[in-house]
Amino acid sequence: MTIRIAINGFGRIGRSVVRALYESGKTDLFTLVSINELAPASGIAHLLKYDSTHGRFPFSVSEKENQLIINGDEIALTHIGNLNSLPWQQQNIDIVLDCTGKYGNKADGLSHINRGAKKVLFSHPGSQDIDATIIYGINHQTLTSSDRVVSNGSCTTNCIVPVIKVIDEAFGVESGSITTIHSSMHDQQVIDAYHKDLRLSRAASQSIIPVDTKLAAGIERILPKFKGRFEAIAVRVPTINVTAMDLSLTVNNDVCICDINQAIQAATSNHDLYGVLSYTEEPLVSVDFNHDPHSCIVDGNQTRVSHKRLIKMLVWCDNEWGFANRMLDTAMAMHQAEN
């Protein structure tokens, strides 16, 4: 029996999840029952079919009254703004993938459950009161049947935590710092316009823009041993997709570049990290990682070691596509924890 899922919020991540579901052939594992999005059906269908970042969707898409039809599959389409009015019970939903970016606390999750969903997975960091934050490949094995309100973390946490964990297990990590070099996002302006964050009021295509980040807190949440030992900053750059992470680590043992790269290469075949962590030595640029399903790709040519214990690494991710694939992986892990 397939897992019956609904998607609440059909923006960049919601649409990427649907694309990943069909393009990966996982429709034999999941049944997409319902999509709830305030936008009109014509816009929903059009932006699923045509995407400036990921190209044309290679499956048929059409819409009719209250339905989106993908590759012949009829998916209920609703436009409900109140969580307390969603039709999950009537639709017998197993897991809601909440991709709005608007909700993220336990009460929000329970609103979905009170409407009939069995479980909820947020596509962004959740508050401290939710049942679990999962970085697939790192702690998805800890899920239990009682974890009903779950967060998939952030794209950057999914990108960096596997690398930190591998290096820590191999050499021992003392502390670290990270600079996230992130593509533009929907909260930025096309041209200068008012925004409460004055830096975000500037045109996205014209500047490298420093922004706030809670990445260090996200690392501590998954790897609590590092509490107070990581710092992070972030900038947005004028590209529409793919993120690079500039990672610096101080380790407890003497290492060389080969040691670091070999540890990463070995970890890519680890059962939990297979399909999550990747490694390359090709001379690639950011666009080459567009539509890459991994959470993190280590660029071995950029690994550096200073004074035997200070490591610098460059880690890439498609901040949309990799994360969308992990949403499906985590949803599957939530279902398996129930059985």
Curated annotation (Swiss-Prot):
InterPro entries attached to this UniProt entry: E4P_DH_bac, GlycerAld/Erythrose_P_DH, GlycerAld_3-P_DH_cat, GlycerAld_3-P_DH_NAD(P)-bd, NAD(P)-bd_dom_sf
Positions with a binding annotation for NAD(+): R12, I13, N319
Keywords noted in UniProt: Cytoplasm, NAD, Oxidoreductase, Pyridoxine biosynthesis
Catalysed reactions, as listed in the record: D-erythrose 4-phosphate + NAD(+) + H2O = 4-phospho-D-erythronate + NADH + 2 H(+)
One GO cellular component, as annotated: cytoplasm
SUPFAM superfamilies in UniProt: Glyceraldehyde-3-phosphate dehydrogenase-like, C-terminal domain (SSF55347), NAD(P)-binding Rossmann-fold domains (SSF51735)
GO biological process: pyridoxal phosphate biosynthetic process; pyridoxine biosynthetic process
CDD domains (UniProt xref): GAPDH_C_E4PDH (cd23937)
Record carries keyword Cytoplasm: yes
Listed Gene3D superfamilies: Dihydrodipicolinate Reductase, domain 2 (3.30.360.10), NAD(P)-binding Rossmann-like Domain (3.40.50.720)
Domain of life: Bacteria
Sites annotated Activates thiol group during catalysis: H182
Functional pathway: Cofactor biosynthesis; pyridoxine 5'-phosphate biosynthesis; pyridoxine 5'-phosphate from D-erythrose 4-phosphate: step 1/5
One Pfam family this sequence matches: Gp_dh_N
Active site positions, chain numbering: C155 (nucleophile)
Keyword Nucleotide-binding carried by entry: no
Subunit architecture: Homotetramer.
Function: Catalyzes the NAD-dependent conversion of D-erythrose 4-phosphate to 4-phosphoerythronate.
Designated name of the protein: D-erythrose-4-phosphate dehydrogenase
